[in-house]
């Protein structure tokens, strides 16, 4: 009996017969040995070949398996190689290999212009291998010169967005005239629109060069780490100098944080000091004014007990003027005084005629003694007294005696006159 004869579970045609829920199995034949080896059960979708000799069937099966394995390995290797060679979305921009040499060749030009010109030149060279390299270099040079003329008067380092649309190189529906002129000067023949990338826009701004290809891909070419960005360095210097100090012989006042309070404190510390002698003089003057006010109250209350409210208001204003405190600079203020007596007149402003500059009638004033010495002069009289009470005033009616800093007043006026004055 041949070792390749069919068994109970195999039909003569080589097809697999399944019984019940038993899994399908394949018998792999080893041509070197006579017994048949059966591997562990596994599912398989491989259908045996049409009826043939056992050796041919086994050979075909081995060939198919080897072919499938070889094809799968070759397809996987080809797919991996194709995936590694296919361009990624971020590899559209060609590398700027000689950018450092170009920057050194144009030290007086802005690096933004050099980077932009190098990118367009290398893109043109990569897409058109038949263009000589010398023409590509000339194209780059002419483009740098053209960009230099374009940004003249439209370059604002403090406002990079200003003039952005004017400086941009646009190849959308039409090709930018800047590129076409540079190609013409570089002896690059042919339709230039077919030589460069379309649907590309490049923005050349102070401190930044970015291009967009299509609608979704965008890449920044400048700044980059290999070259120092002098604009960022300039901005760092400005940030370090933001704190400005004003220095004098005594101290330093920073004005970048809370300058108003510091300057105010500095001025207060220098101006609020009063010499001891001057402050003592102010205290003595205030004491003298207080004593005079007490004397004034005693005498005037006895003299004008029945006077009108006008004379009382005049007296209150007089007390305010005598008790008015001097300022830091020891100068008397010539403004209206506020009546601050305890008679319910708080916050009341005096009349302009009763201000500190107006002459005030007071018994302690030198003007009062001058009136007594020249009592026969009818031109001077107390301003608040009624005119009919002063009609018969003479030197015999009023006598003033001073002794031990006390003033006494004797009046010969009868009470009938007082009653007559207020009848």
UniProtKB/Swiss-Prot annotation:
Coiled-coil residues? none
* Region Disordered, annotated ranges: 1-54, 69-96, 257-297, 341-398
The residue ranges flagged as biased composition, category Low complexity, are 43-54, 257-272, 284-297, 341-351, 369-379
Organism superkingdom:
Eukaryota
Of the GO CC terms on this record, one is: cytoplasm
Q: Which Pfam families match?
A: BTG
One biological process GO term for this chain? cell fate commitment
Record's compositionally biased regions (Polar residues): 19-28, 273-283, 352-367
Q: Which InterPro entries match?
A: Anti_prolifrtn, BTG, BTG-like_sf
Please report which protein family the annotation says this sequence is part of: Belongs to the BTG family.
- Its name, as the record gives it, is BTG family protein
Name the lineage.
Eukaryota, Amoebozoa, Evosea, Eumycetozoa, Dictyostelia
């Amino acid at each position: 009996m041949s070792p390749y004869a069919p068994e109970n579970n195999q039909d003569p045609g080589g097809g697999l017969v399944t019984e019940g829920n038993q899994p399908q199995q394949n018998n792999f034949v080893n041509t070197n040995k006579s017994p048949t080896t059966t591997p562990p059960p596994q599912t398989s979708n491989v259908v045996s070949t049409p009826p043939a000799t056992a050796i041919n069937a086994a050979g075909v099966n081995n060939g198919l398996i080897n072919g499938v394995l070889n094809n799968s390995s070759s397809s996987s290797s080809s797919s991996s190689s194709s995936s590694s060679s296919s361009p990624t979305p971020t590899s559209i921009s060609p590398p700027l290999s000689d950018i450092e040499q170009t920057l050194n060749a144009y030290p007086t030009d802005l690096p933004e212009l050099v980077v932009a010109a190098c990118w367009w030149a290398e893109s043109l060279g990569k897409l058109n291998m038949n263009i000589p390299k010398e023409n590509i270099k000339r194209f780059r040079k002419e483009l740098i010169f053209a960009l230099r003329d374009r940004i003249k008067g439209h370059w604002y380092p403090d406002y990079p967005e200003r003039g952005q649309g004017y400086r941009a190189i646009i190849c959308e529906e039409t090709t930018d005239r800047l590129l076409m002129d540079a190609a013409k000067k570089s002896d690059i023949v042919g339709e230039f629109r077919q030589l460069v990338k379309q649907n590309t826009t490049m923005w050349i701004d102070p401190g930044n060069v970015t291009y967009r290809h299509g609608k979704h891909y965008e890449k920044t070419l400048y700044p980059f780490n290999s070259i120092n960005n002098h604009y960022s360095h300039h901005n760092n210097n400005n940030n370090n100098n933001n704190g400005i100090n004003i220095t004098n012989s005594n101290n330093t006042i920073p004005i970048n944080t809370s300058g108003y309070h510091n300057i105010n404190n500095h001025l207060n510390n220098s101006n609020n000091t009063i010499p001891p002698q001057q402050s003592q003089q102010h205290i003595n003057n205030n004491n003298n004014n207080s004593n005079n006010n007490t004397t004034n109250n005693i005498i005037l209350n006895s003299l004008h007990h029945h006077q009108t409210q006008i004379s009382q208001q005049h007296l209150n204003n007089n007390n305010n003027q005598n008790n008015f405190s001097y300022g830091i600079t020891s100068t008397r203020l010539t403004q209206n005084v506020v009546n601050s007596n305890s008679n319910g007149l708080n916050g009341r402003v005096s009349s302009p005629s009763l201000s500190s500059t107006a002459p005030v009638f007071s018994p302690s004033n030198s003007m009062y003694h001058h009136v007594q010495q020249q009592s026969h002069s009818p031109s001077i009289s107390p301003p608040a007294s009624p005119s009919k009470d002063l009609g018969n005033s003479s030197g015999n009616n009023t006598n003033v005696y001073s002794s031990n800093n006390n003033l006494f007043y004797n009046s010969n006026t009868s009470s009938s006159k007082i009653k007559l004055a207020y009848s």
